[in-house]
């Protein structure tokens, strides 16, 4: 690693099965983008790659490697030669990959054929930024070991995926389980929300952009209960938080709705200031 932007971490698809020990799943915030990057280089979908916040990454190949970059639309060059989005590239020893800053989207993924083979913790190579479990965030000077290439080979050179935009996002959510704690839970689905600058891998915090406020009808707080990926928790401020990859496994604020699993990746790519609305499904 020659240079690291705001944050770069090693991520795979997480460490499920440890909730009873107080450990969350973590893993890639945008799982679809990591899976795609791995498929492009012929890896199993859950192989560890690099998750880059906004961009600013620079790395040098120490030997021949096959790489793919997916997710946010950060410009990528290899020895100053532009690399297309969601495409496969062969890098030779000494070649330099530079990633600029994304114009749209928030997180970019770099997969290397063979996967990043840092030491696993509880069965996963993912960094959990809430608990501190897993490999440290990447720093300049880090040398990343690459695993043995799989027997399967890449079958395409590029994946035709739509570019992420800065337009209004529509996110599907199921009401409940604590919708009855609110005077009008339908207010969540009315008007628009804006992604707050106070957003990270733990959760996407939202500010009201237009529409009615969320008002509680039940005073006090809940006994601590389990929290799931995509839970929309509402603290006393009335500003909802959509729980992302590194979310706490328990919480005491009511969950007004749960974002469907397929749309959690969309929320994880939403930039601060971007408009968002919830669409109710049953």
What are these regions (language model features)?
Residues 1-282:
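Conserved "landmark" site that anchors the functional core of diverse proteins
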């Amino acid at each position: 690693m020659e240079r690291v932007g705001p944050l770069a971490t090693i991520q795979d698809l997480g460490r499920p099965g440890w909730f009873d020990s107080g450990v969350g799943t973590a893993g890639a915030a945008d799982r679809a983008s990591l899976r795609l990057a791995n498929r492009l280089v012929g890896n199993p979908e859950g192989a560890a790659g690099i998750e880059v916040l906004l961009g600013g990454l620079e790395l040098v190949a120490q030997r021949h490697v096959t790489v793919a970059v997916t997710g946010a639309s950060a410009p990528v060059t290899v020895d100053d030669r532009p690399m297309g989005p969601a495409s496969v590239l062969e890098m030779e020893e000494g070649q330099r990959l530079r990633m600029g800053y994304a114009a749209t989207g928030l997180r970019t993924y770099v997969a290397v054929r063979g996967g990043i083979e840092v030491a696993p913790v509880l069965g996963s190579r993912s960094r959990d930024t809430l608990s501190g479990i897993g490999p440290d965030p990447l720093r300049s000077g880090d040398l990343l070991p690459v695993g043995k290439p799989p027997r399967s080979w890449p079958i395409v050179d590029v994946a035709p995926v739509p570019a992420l935009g800065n337009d209004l996002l529509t996110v599907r959510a199921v009401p409940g389980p604590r919708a009855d704690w609110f005077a009008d839970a339908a207010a969540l689905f009315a008007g628009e929300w804006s992604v707050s600058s106070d957003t990270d891998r733990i959760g996407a915090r939202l500010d009201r952009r237009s529409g009615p406020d969320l008002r509680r009808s039940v005073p006090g707080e809940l006994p601590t209960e389990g929290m799931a990926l995509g839970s929309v928790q509402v603290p006393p401020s009335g500003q909802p938080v959509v729980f992302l990859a590194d979310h706490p496994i328990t919480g005491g604020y009511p969950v007004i709705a749960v974002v469907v699993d397929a749309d959690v990746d969309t929320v994880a790519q939403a930039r601060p200031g971007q408009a968002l609305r919830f669409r109710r499904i049953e």
